[in-house]
Design a protein with these regions (language model features):
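Histidine-centered catalytic micro-motifs used for acid/base chemistry in nuclease
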Residues: 40-44
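Short, charged/polar surface micro-motifs in flexible loops or helix N-caps
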Residues: 35-36, 47, 64-68
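Short, exposed beta-strand "edge-strand" segments with a Pro/Gly-rich flavor and a Y/T-containing core
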Residues: 6-12, 55-61, 70
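Short linker/helix segments within small regulatory modules
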Residues: 45-58
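Short Cys/His-centered divalent metal-binding micro-motifs
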Residues: 58-87
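Alpha-helical and His/Cys-centered functional microenvironments
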Residues: 46-47, 70, 74, 99
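A boundary/linker detector
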Residues: 1-26, 31-38, 80-125
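Residues in flexible loops and secondary-structure boundaries
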Residues: 28, 49-52, 77
Protein backbone atom coordinates (compact mmCIF):
# COMPACT_ATOMS: atom_id res chain seq x y z
CA UNK A 1 0.00 0.00 0.00
CA UNK A 2 1.32 3.44 -0.92
CA UNK A 3 2.25 5.86 1.83
CA UNK A 4 0.17 9.00 2.20
CA UNK A 5 1.66 12.43 1.50
CA UNK A 6 1.47 13.15 5.24
CA UNK A 7 3.37 9.99 6.17
CA UNK A 8 6.05 10.71 3.57
CA UNK A 9 6.38 14.33 4.70
CA UNK A 10 6.98 13.28 8.33
CA UNK A 11 9.81 10.86 7.49
CA UNK A 12 13.45 11.96 7.80
CA UNK A 13 15.54 10.83 4.82
CA UNK A 14 19.21 9.84 4.99
CA UNK A 15 20.04 12.95 2.97
CA UNK A 16 18.21 15.18 5.44
CA UNK A 17 20.00 13.56 8.37
CA UNK A 18 23.36 14.18 6.72
CA UNK A 19 22.52 17.83 5.95
CA UNK A 20 21.41 18.35 9.57
CA UNK A 21 24.65 16.83 10.89
CA UNK A 22 26.71 19.02 8.54
CA UNK A 23 24.73 22.12 9.54
CA UNK A 24 25.41 21.39 13.19
CA UNK A 25 29.02 20.36 12.56
CA UNK A 26 28.34 16.93 14.08
CA UNK A 27 27.44 18.44 17.46
CA UNK A 28 24.18 18.49 19.36
CA UNK A 29 22.66 21.93 19.73
CA UNK A 30 23.91 21.72 23.33
CA UNK A 31 27.48 21.46 22.03
CA UNK A 32 28.00 17.76 22.82
CA UNK A 33 29.86 15.81 20.12
CA UNK A 34 27.57 13.42 18.24
CA UNK A 35 28.55 9.86 17.38
CA UNK A 36 26.69 7.17 15.42
CA UNK A 37 25.79 5.65 18.80
CA UNK A 38 24.31 8.68 20.57
CA UNK A 39 22.66 10.66 17.75
CA UNK A 40 18.91 11.04 17.33
CA UNK A 41 16.95 13.34 15.05
CA UNK A 42 14.19 15.40 16.62
CA UNK A 43 11.20 17.05 14.93
CA UNK A 44 11.08 20.54 16.49
CA UNK A 45 7.42 20.73 15.51
CA UNK A 46 6.41 17.25 16.61
CA UNK A 47 5.25 14.59 14.17
CA UNK A 48 2.08 14.35 16.26
CA UNK A 49 1.47 18.01 15.40
CA UNK A 50 2.02 17.24 11.68
CA UNK A 51 5.64 18.38 11.80
CA UNK A 52 7.50 17.55 8.60
CA UNK A 53 10.79 15.67 8.34
CA UNK A 54 12.67 18.29 6.35
CA UNK A 55 15.90 19.84 7.57
CA UNK A 56 14.23 23.12 8.54
CA UNK A 57 12.26 21.21 11.22
CA UNK A 58 14.92 18.74 12.37
CA UNK A 59 17.75 19.02 14.88
CA UNK A 60 20.30 16.40 15.87
CA UNK A 61 20.58 15.81 19.61
CA UNK A 62 21.93 13.06 21.82
CA UNK A 63 19.70 10.15 22.75
CA UNK A 64 19.85 11.27 26.41
CA UNK A 65 18.74 14.81 25.47
CA UNK A 66 15.98 13.41 23.27
CA UNK A 67 14.61 11.16 25.99
CA UNK A 68 14.79 13.93 28.63
CA UNK A 69 13.09 16.43 26.33
CA UNK A 70 10.17 14.13 25.53
CA UNK A 71 9.85 13.31 29.24
CA UNK A 72 9.80 17.06 30.06
CA UNK A 73 12.93 16.68 32.19
CA UNK A 74 15.96 18.93 32.62
CA UNK A 75 18.61 18.46 29.95
CA UNK A 76 21.92 17.36 31.43
CA UNK A 77 25.25 17.98 29.74
CA UNK A 78 28.22 16.16 31.27
CA UNK A 79 26.03 15.16 34.21
CA UNK A 80 25.01 18.72 35.11
CA UNK A 81 21.74 20.52 34.52
CA UNK A 82 22.23 22.70 31.50
CA UNK A 83 18.73 23.50 30.29
CA UNK A 84 15.17 23.17 31.46
CA UNK A 85 12.75 21.47 29.09
CA UNK A 86 11.39 24.89 28.05
CA UNK A 87 14.86 26.41 27.54
CA UNK A 88 15.89 23.47 25.36
CA UNK A 89 12.78 23.89 23.21
CA UNK A 90 13.58 27.58 22.74
CA UNK A 91 17.20 26.72 21.93
CA UNK A 92 16.08 24.33 19.17
CA UNK A 93 13.73 26.90 17.60
CA UNK A 94 16.35 29.66 17.81
CA UNK A 95 18.88 27.35 16.16
CA UNK A 96 16.55 26.89 13.19
CA UNK A 97 15.72 30.61 13.02
CA UNK A 98 19.44 31.33 12.88
CA UNK A 99 19.98 28.94 9.98
CA UNK A 100 16.81 29.41 7.88
CA UNK A 101 15.61 32.74 6.58
CA UNK A 102 11.90 33.17 7.29
CA UNK A 103 11.66 30.18 9.64
CA UNK A 104 8.21 29.93 11.22
CA UNK A 105 6.50 27.10 13.07
CA UNK A 106 3.57 27.16 10.64
CA UNK A 107 5.90 26.39 7.73
CA UNK A 108 7.00 23.19 9.47
CA UNK A 109 3.50 21.70 9.66
CA UNK A 110 1.96 19.60 6.93
CA UNK A 111 -1.28 21.04 5.54
CA UNK A 112 -3.76 19.41 3.17
CA UNK A 113 -2.33 21.21 0.15
CA UNK A 114 1.21 21.31 1.53
CA UNK A 115 4.01 21.10 -1.00
CA UNK A 116 7.67 21.03 -0.02
CA UNK A 117 8.45 23.58 -2.73
CA UNK A 118 5.97 26.06 -1.23
CA UNK A 119 7.81 25.99 2.07
CA UNK A 120 11.42 25.92 0.94
CA UNK A 121 13.43 28.10 3.25
CA UNK A 122 16.78 29.51 2.35
CA UNK A 123 19.56 28.13 4.46
CA UNK A 124 21.88 30.87 5.66
CA UNK A 125 25.56 30.02 5.89
Amino acid sequence: MAKSKLTKAKEISKETKERVLERQRYKSISGVALTPYNTEFHHVIFRSESGVGYEFNIVAITSEEHRAFHDHQNILVNGRKRYTYIEFGILMKNHLKLHYSGWEESKCRFHKYWDEEDYKMTRME
